[in-house]
Design a protein with these regions (language model features):
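Domain-level signature for soluble enzymes in the chorismate/prephenate branch of the shikimate pathway
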Residues: 1-139
Length: 139
C-alpha cells in the first residue's frame, strides 16, 4: 500500500456527505454542488432513501426539493418531511431548463408526441399546447 493511500482513505472517511434523489448530473445534484460544494454528493433512488441516508448516518445532510416554481409544491416532500426527524436549515434555488429533443433531421412541426417524466410534462405543457404536441408520460 502506498503511504498516500492511507491518507486518501482517511480523508474519504472524513468527508461529509449530502444525499439527494436522482442520478449524478440531475438538478438536485446540481443544487448540491451549488449550495454545498464542500460536501460529497450521495445519489439515492427515492426521497425515502435520502431521508434514511441522513437518519442512518450515511450522510450528514439531505438536499430535497420542496417547491418547483412551475409545478408547485413537491407533495412527497410535504408528506415525508414532518415525520422524517429532519428540518430545513438552508435553501438554494436551481434554474431548471427543459429541452425538447428529436432525431437529427426532425423539425418542430414534425413532432406530434413528447414523452417525458410525469413531473416534467406539466412544466412544459404551455409550450406543448402551443405547438400541438401531445404529452405522454414515459414509462
Amino acid at each position: 500500500m502506498h503511504p498516500n493511500d492511507a491518507v486518501r482513505e482517511k480523508n474519504k472517511k472524513m468527508t461529509k456527505k449530502i444525499a439527494f434523489q436522482g442520478a449524478l448530473g440531475a438538478y438536485s445534484h446540481e443544487a448540491c454542488n451549488a449550495a454545498r460544494p464542500d460536501l460529497e454528493p450521495l445519489a439515492c433512488k427515492t426521497f425515502d432513501q435520502v431521508i434514511a441516508a441522513v437518519n442512518s448516518g450515511q450522510a450528514e445532510y439531505a438536499m430535497l426539493p420542496v417547491e418547483n416554481s412551475t409545478y408547485g409544491r413537491v407533495a412527497d416532500i410535504h408528506r415525508l418531511l414532518p415525520k422524517s426527524g429532519l428540518h430545513i436549515i438552508d435553501e438554494t434555488f436551481t434554474r431548471v431548463r427543459i429541452s425538447l429533443m428529436a432525431n437529427q433531421g426532425v423539425s418542430l412541426p414534425d413532432v406530434t408526441v413528447a414523452r417525458a417524466h410525469l413531473v416534467l410534462l406539466p412544466q412544459a405543457q404551455k409550450f406543448l399546447d402551443e405547438h400541438d404536441i401531445r404529452a405522454e408520460p414515459a414509462v
